[in-house]
């Protein structure tokens, strides 16, 4: 579990939705330097993914009590596992399946942004990543209502 220190020095759990806020700021920032702009858009995609991945993982771990996500030395690819657990969830609720599908799609965008030397339509890809992230977070919040 990751904690940050609050103003009074007490441990606080990190709010992963803050990564989405950062992603939105990065994507909205205009820059005259094209290299800097590209770095911001790529970072926006990456932060959007990690925001939703961590929230989805925590839902499975903390709400669904998934035992595989409690272990320190995991024998799974956590990124694939979390998405597939939503897609193939025993309830097969439409919301659950959509979360998994959107998370997989967002991960593909994140991998391109983090590892590909050239990325086409970066502005559009960043908008898509933010939309997917917002949809995932909305769907996750509906599951906990």
Give the role of each language-model region.
Residues 1-145:
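Terminal alpha-helical segments
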């Amino acid at each position: 579990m990751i904690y940050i220190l609050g103003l009074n020095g007490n441990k606080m759990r990190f709010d992963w939705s803050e990564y989405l806020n950062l992603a939105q700021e990065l994507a909205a920032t205009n820059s005259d330097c094209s290299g800097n702009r590209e770095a911001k858009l790529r970072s926006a995609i990456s932060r959007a993914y990690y925001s939703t991945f961590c929230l989805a993982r925590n839902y499975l771990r903390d709400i669904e009590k998934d035992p595989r996500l409690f272990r320190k030395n995991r024998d799974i690819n956590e990124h694939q596992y979390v998405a597939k657990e939503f897609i193939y969830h025993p309830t097969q609720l439409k919301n659950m399946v959509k979360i998994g599908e959107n998370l997989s799609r967002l991960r593909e965008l994140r991998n391109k942004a983090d590892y590909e030397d050239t990325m086409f339509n970066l502005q559009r890809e960043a908008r898509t990543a933010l939309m997917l992230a917002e949809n995932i977070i909305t769907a996750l919040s509906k599951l906990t209502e």
